[in-house]
């Protein structure tokens, strides 16, 4: 009963917050873009405004989808989120093909299917939350009043995690503003590399969800030896998966780039960065982003947040600006700053993990 009440409070609060953020972005999109990216080409700014305005209308749907997806994962119902995510992506891809290649809508042709797919996914997964056979469901829980005690408990975990993610995304935007000054070839190469990089890290994304669930159970049972064992095992499996994909992407980078219709300069730059990323990701990504999930699962949320914000801003953002505006190194240096950020995170997280403070934190909580 308490879990069901908490589920609705999470959904209600997230939806309200997403609505407020949407209003801010819609009304202040122009100054926000100029603040983040400064002076960029007029065509790029126009396209950015179009994409931002359209996708901002999907923030509420995204909040509903993410909240419900998290609840299904908490019930070990990851198959539900997989199928809903698949539906969302199919709608998005088909919509992009129709709007871009059929209707020639440009940037709007990318943004509109994205927005529609998010609303479809939000509606579907929200309705699935009303199945009474589910351990956590929303049947009989609909109320428009906030439960203060529940919200406090939720925010205790949500605020550090949300602040970390917010600072991370803001840092990425600021880094993008540096990339935007390098011209359209660099912007295109950076975007394509980012897409391929996400493929490279897919095993890590999947295993990270498992780490949170498995370690939470171990910590709840007081079996910290098991928490450490499964952290090592899952991180090892993820690194093997990422390593295999890294080899494939390193060798096939010239072929993959041909699917994106890039110019010669952008294509060559993309191949170079994809290969550098493949090597770095195989060794650095999982310790930097998997180990902190063990700490969070044990209730140690402030330390990962502090390290992530410190490393992101001091190393990735500041170094990116130094490399770009002081040293004039180009796009590759932007990604090198990111890899340095990963190394710093890895050092701090592994040292914390090897100690016992996070275990004591779990016992107190």
Regions found by a protein language model. Give the residues of each.
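Short runs within selected transmembrane alpha-helices of multi-pass transporters and secretion channels
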Residues: 54-73, 81-92, 110-125, 204-208, ...
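Small-residue-rich hydrophobic transmembrane alpha-helices
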Residues: 1-23, 62-81, 176, 187-253, ...
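Short alpha-helical transmembrane segments in multi-pass integral membrane proteins
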Residues: 1-58, 102-159, 215-281, 324-365
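Residue-level hotspots within pore-lining transmembrane alpha-helices
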Residues: 20, 24, 56, 60-61, ...
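Short loop-to-helix capping motifs
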Residues: 77-78, 106, 183-184, 263, ...
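Transmembrane helical elements of multi-pass membrane transporters/channels
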Residues: 54, 65, 88, 117-121, ...
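Hydrophobic/aromatic end-of-helix segments at the C-terminal termini of transmembrane alpha-helices
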Residues: 29-32, 95, 170-179, 183, ...
